[in-house]
């Protein structure tokens, strides 16, 4: 199949496997959920009745006071006591094998092509780290909410895009399922497309 280059009167030959496969919604959902779960810190922690300091002495005798019996002032019933089912640090990451991850990326890229959300150009960059220059180039391509993917992150391009809302710059190794679907359009250079094909082959 072919991808038309936006800035040149030519087309780029790409494989059907990477850019023309059927969209697998269940797979994409599973990989995106796993990716988001892996980003969770999972460091929350609360103390149970045995971990709260104090409470070693019985507050009053068992019988004869007229009050409810109590063995410790750190019971979950008491103010300042432990938590009944205390939250503990845990690892939320989910296992996703390489084949599933590749398949999800290929599904997303193929869907981007079908929805005309993937814009391919021969080359893309800025001469100086100037936001105004980058903005002019993006406006020429009618792009506002965009992920820019290049073979390597050029410093000038990265610095120029840093202050732009809804514009991000990644290299080929930095793309992931979440970033590919988070933006309205994805702008790729021809070299980046070739590298992605090799990476997902």
UniProtKB/Swiss-Prot annotation:
GO terms for biological process: translation. Transmembrane segments: none annotated. GO terms for molecular function: rRNA binding; structural constituent of ribosome. The keyword Ribonucleoprotein applies. GO terms for cellular component: ribonucleoprotein complex; ribosome. Keywords: Ribonucleoprotein, Ribosomal protein, RNA-binding, rRNA-binding. Belongs to the universal ribosomal protein uL4 family. This is Large ribosomal subunit protein uL4. It comes from Tolumonas auensis (strain DSM 9187 / NBRC 110442 / TA 4). The lineage of its organism: Bacteria, Pseudomonadati, Pseudomonadota, Gammaproteobacteria, Aeromonadales. The gene is rplD.
